[in-house]
């Protein structure tokens, strides 16, 4: 049975000073916001992305803010590159890692009957296999830290139906179950695992879709809060789940969706 050691009780509950983190896909969107949120709380961070130019632009910005961030180019859909990434992280952080944020994801929007075998394998490799394998690779580092936290950036598509996203939804639903499994299996190693499921968030991934005024109105009509989310509304939850303040929270799937997943039949009462 895992115990809350003196070292955990003695840590500041609302600080990540002295902790280390790996955030995949950290050069834009939710990943970039997560890097900044964790760094603001004092964590040392390594992040990766496929686009070296964009990664270097982000790094210059973080260095100007005084954040402790290192970077490397990595396509996490490749098994060999994931292994090399974790070797790099282990070297930088001297064999210990407190936080793993599996953020990288892709979505191919098509009706189910139009999806190809290539669509399926690419989506699964990028979204699910990468999260599964990186969690495996990170386990000894997380265990060595004495207090580990894994956050899986999932989606409401893994909780409810979203049209045109059948493969994506399958990958995210499996990711949510992975979070529950790891939470139970690795609790004795003082490693917590939680999934965060956003609805539409203002990111480069959805900019083109949301530029269609009719589509945006439809999206905004679904959550009771009547709008899409901002990246910092996701990154703040991710950061909280990594804090000592969240030390008894594990195995949870938490939606950041303005109430989308709990919204039933809404109507205005008759006059």
Swiss-Prot record:
NADP(+) binds at residues 22-46. Belongs to the short-chain dehydrogenases/reductases (SDR) family. SDR65C subfamily. InterPro entries: NAD(P)-bd_dom_sf (IPR036291), Sc_DH/Rdtase_CS (IPR020904), SDR_fam (IPR002347), TR (IPR045000). Oxidoreductase active on cyclic ketones, but not on tropinone or nortropinone. Pfam families: adh_short_C2. The active site is at 168 (proton acceptor). This is Tropinone reductase homolog At2g29360. Substrate binds at residue 155. Changing residue 209 to Y: Loss of activity with quinuclidinone and decreased activity with cyclohexanones. GO terms for molecular function: oxidoreductase activity. Its EC number is 1.1.1.-. Keywords: NADP, Oxidoreductase. Optimum pH is 7.5 for quinuclidinone reduction. Optimum pH is 6.0 for 4-methylcyclohexanone reduction. It is an enzyme of class 1 (oxidoreductase). The lineage of its organism: Eukaryota, Viridiplantae, Streptophyta, Embryophyta, Tracheophyta.
